[in-house]
Regions:
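Beta-rich carbohydrate-recognition and catalytic domains
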Residues: 1-88, 92, 96-146, 150-169
Length: 169
């Protein structure tokens, strides 16, 4: 059997030290930058959040080698308080190139606890400035989250997510 084994490398790739990410850094998703290197998108939480009830937003960092990352200033994607399903947090980004030469980010989103988590998307031409796309991409599952966009060997792609199945027991 041809088995691959993963080995954890020493050191953190991104550490929270700014007001935007001092409290939490989690759920990274990486994309190759067409101009070279890599851009890591991740969830951040800290005292510099965009509004008092915000529970998470998406930040980014760049790297030439995929090991040493430099955080970029600002928030890439923040919750939208006026949109019920996106009012409190945007988490767990995954980024994919589009045929039109732009980029699409899929992410977990949440409003108040009375609404379930959903998967939404945003679009960008430069991977720095993102525009929320209207609507919900995926919904209807308990505990939905953690989207990951994966290109298959034949060129098709799939969007994988986590979800809980709650039985009647």
């Amino acid at each position: 059997m041809n088995e691959k084994r993963w080995r954890k490398e020493p050191g953190a790739r991104v550490e929270g030290f700014r007001d935007l990410d001092r409290s939490k850094v989690q759920a990274p998703g990486i994309a190759r930058d067409p101009s070279g290197g890599f851009r890591l998108f991740y969830t951040g939480v800290g005292p510099g959040r965009p509004f008092p009830t915000c529970q998470g937003y998406i930040l980014s960092a760049v790297s030439d080698d995929g090991l040493s990352f430099r955080p970029e200033p600002g928030i890439r994607l923040a919750p939208q308080p006026g949109v019920p399903h996106m009012g409190l947090r945007t988490l767990s980004p995954t980024v994919a190139p589009c045929e039109e030469g732009c980029w699409r980010m899929y992410f977990e989103s949440r409003g108040p606890a009375s609404l379930p988590t959903v998967i939404c998307s945003a679009i960008s031409t430069d991977m720095l400035h993102w525009k929320h796309e209207d609507g919900i991409r995926l919904q209807g599952f308990d505990g939905l989250g953690g989207p990951r966009y994966v290109v298959l060997p034949d060129g098709r792609a799939r969007l994988f997510c986590c979800a809980e199945e709650r039985g009647s027991d």
